[in-house]
Amino acid sequence: MALRYHIFAGTNAQARHLASIMCMEPGEWRYVHSEEGLIGLRGGVVLCYGTWKDFPDKDKVLTRAKINEMHILEVS
């Protein structure tokens, strides 16, 4: 299975929870805990776990990462 999703979350447990909810297969996603992990992505979809509107550096992250596609999800 090819890597398709980058889950931007506070903890690995949150990333695993989101992957489970979305029925993702192992190898289809990876956990990203900081903006440095997003920089340079060329493909795939970034999924955010949590409340993106409360993330203070969201504009900086998007600009530096040059993300192709981003879906903002609020999962509790």
Question: Language-model features: where?
Answer:
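Short, flexible loop motifs at catalytic/binding sites
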Residues: 1-76
